Swiss-Prot record:
UniProt name for this protein: G protein-coupled receptor associated sorting protein 3
UniProt-annotated stretches for the region Disordered: 1-111, 132-170
Similarity-based family: Belongs to the GPRASP family.
Biological classification of the source: Eukaryota, Metazoa, Chordata, Craniata, Vertebrata
Pfam families associated with the record: Arm_2
Subunit record text: Homodimer.
Composition bias, Polar residues: 132-146
Length: 539
């Protein structure tokens, strides 16, 4: 009795479950149909209902599982019921559903099948709706078989659709990126390069080139602004002057030549000057005034910054002006400008001119400047007699001695002249000419500076080797000047030269080349030699 009651209860429960399952199946079909028609809201509700029903049935099935296990013969029947349940799901027939759901194991198989097809399909379908992929199902018939196939294969469809979505996103982003790139950049850019302007090249005109060396000129043309150049403006020599000849006029002549300078300035360009010098416009009177101020006050009032130091004094300047009045040679005028400090040149050039002596140098150039004089000199040198050559040499030595003693004391011109005289006195044939200037040379020895004394002592040393010249050196004035050399402040070279001079004179007296007749002079000479010997020993 009790067993029949339990069986009746179990059967009632099964019928109740079958009705619930039929209701759930109908709701699922309605949900599938609504999804095919594009009703997303109804589909969500159907899925939620099916899910709750499946959970409720799972709870009921777990309670009746104990009763169903007592029936061992129900397993083959459960297989048939499970098969019928699947057929019912595919065909949607209620008759087969009621007979097939009388066994307990069929509920379990339906539950797990429903869970796989319901929950998974709900999960993946929801994502498909978010990705706008439901439109593919609208063109197909809404059947339960197609819906079931879609529910059993959610992962494959997700993978394929997600790949399509990635490709679509890549296409969208890529198209936007490259379209922006195309609009931002030129598809056919032009090359960027720098235009280098070629430098103009001066073409050489073959017609203007000189055909012979005689057409080549070294000195430039005269500038438009006349710089300070010494010279004499003769009326008939303007046509025969070279192009580089420039005139320096005095104050009286400046007013008369202003119009001529203005006319030339509009016709001739200003060229560069030789020696790397710059012009300095000054008149003869201005230079004279500057020399006078320097001699009176001992200063150099050069207002122009391009001027260099001028070593000329008033007599030498006037002599230079008188010499330049007789010539139009541009080289001589340029040397005069450098000597006067009018042109700023390399210090070596000015030092050379000052040491040689500008007057001496210009006179030497004037003596051999013209080609006729040079040819005549060569003929005389080769074919003339010894008397003519000797006369020329004597004239040169006399001229150098005269120029040297006429220079200011310790001036560069004087020192240059002493150097030349020292070279000329290496031969004894010229000593008799220099002897006539002994008094002036001894004055330079006693009054000159250290360099001047050194040059004078070299001249005396050369002449002391000649007995005839040494005899003229034995007098009180000469020996007193030589004795002044021996002091503690004198240069060593000067002391050596002075000692050598005394030794040469002593040797001439000892050998008898020099005979002293006057006893007073001999005693004086002996006393001087003993005094000098004592000074040398003490030093």
């Amino acid at each position: 009795m009790t067993g029949s009651k339990n069986k009746a209860r179990a059967q009632a429960k099964l019928e109740k479950r079958a009705s619930a399952q039929a209701k759930a199946a109908a709701e699922r079909e309605a949900a599938n149909a609504g999804r095919g028609a594009g009703k997303n809201r109804d589909k969500g509700k159907g899925k939620a209902g099916s899910k709750t029903d499946a959970v409720a049935e799972a709870k009921a099935g777990s309670k009746s599982k104990v009763v169903a296990e007592t029936k061992e013969g129900a397993r083959p029947e459960s297989k048939a019921v499970a098969k019928g349940t699947s057929d019912f799901n595919h065909k949607a027939e209620n008759k087969y559903a009621r007979s097939a759901r009388k066994d307990k194991p069929s509920s379990d198989s339906w539950f797990w099948a429903g869970e796989d097809s319901g929950i998974n399909s709900w999960f993946w379908k929801g994502e498909e709706v978010s990705n706008n992929s439901v439109a593919k199902c609208e063109n197909k018939p809404s059947t339960s078989i197609q819906a079931r196939v879609e529910e059993h294969t959610p992962r494959t469809s997700h993978k394929s659709r997600s790949g399509a979505e990635e490709e679509e996103e890549e296409n969208v982003i890529g198209n936007w990126f490259w379209e922006g790139d195309d609009t931002g950049f030129d598809s056919d850019p032009k090359p960027v390069f720098k235009i280098v302007k070629p430098q103009p090249v001066d073409e050489i005109n073959e017609k203007d080139r000189p055909k012979d060396w005689s057409e080549v000129t070294i000195w430039p043309k005269a500038p438009a602004v006349t710089p300070a150049v010494l010279g004499y403006r003769s009326q008939d020599s303007s046509e025969g002057r070279p192009s580089s000849y420039i005139v320096l006029a005095s104050n009286e002549e400046e007013t008369s030549t202003t119009c001529t300078k203005n006319t030339r300035s509009s016709l001739q360009p200003i060229p560069e000057y030789p020696f790397g010098s710059d012009p300095c416009i000054q008149t003869l009177d201005e230079i004279r005034q500057q020399i006078k101020i320097r001699e009176e006050n001992g200063i150099k009032p050069f207002a122009c910054p391009c001027k260099m130091e001028c070593y000329l004094d008033s007599p030498e300047f006037e002599k230079l002006v008188n010499i330049l009045k007789s010539t139009t040679d541009p080289l001589i005028h340029k040397i005069a400008q450098i000597a006067m400090g009018i042109h700023k040149v390399h210090p070596f050039a000015q030092e050379f001119i000052n040491e040689v002596g500008v007057v001496t140098l210009i006179e030497s150039l004037l003596s051999f400047s013209s080609p006729e004089v040079s040819i005549k000199k060569a003929v005389i040198t080769l074919n003339s007699s010894g008397d003519d050559r000797q006369q020329m040499v004597e004239f040169h030595v006399k001229h150098m001695c005269k120029e040297t003693v006429s220079f200011p004391l310790n001036s560069p011109g004087q020192q240059s002249g002493l150097k030349i005289i020292g070279q000329l006195t290496t031969e004894s044939v010229h000593h008799y000419i220099v002897v006539s200037y002994f008094s002036e040379l001894f004055h330079l020895l006693s009054q000159g500076n250290r360099k001047t004394r050194n040059l004078v002592l070299k001249v005396f040393l050369n002449m002391s080797e000649n007995p005839k010249a040494a005899r003229d050196m034995i007098n009180m004035k000469a020996l007193a000047a030589l004795k002044l050399i021996f002091n503690q402040k004198e240069a060593k070279a000067n002391l050596v030269s002075a000692v050598a001079i005394f030794i040469n004179i002593k040797e001439h007296i000892r050998k008898g080349s020099i005979v002293v007749v006057d006893h007073l002079s001999y005693n004086t000479l002996t006393a001087i030699f003993r005094e000098v010997k004592g000074i040398i020993e003490r030093m």
